């Protein structure tokens, strides 16, 4: 059962990693719900750590989840390698577990969801990164439910 995530990890912060910005969502394993909370700017994939420190301080997550933008054939892309490095940095900086998950279709799904909610399609001025982060986290929550004592 090495793949089982500890029940102690209840509140999870997720990231849709990007070169220009990172979408962020928070979720609860108890309710299996996730909500987009914000989007922070990044310079060539590096976040503003001071800004991120404030968000982590405010939300107090037990763990992190970072979406890996793999190639469609499942192999690592340059961006997924960067996202993996970011995940490792989160763990090192905040001392909390950081997980990664395949997020190949999350941006597409986020755009579809945004369109359903009336998004006009101007993704540069009105990005969907936090919706993508929410979808990434929702997927992770469904794959990692709290374990019940049988």
Segments and roles (model prediction):
Residues 2-15, 19-150:
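Phosphate- and other anionic-substrate recognition elements at nucleic-acid/protein interfaces
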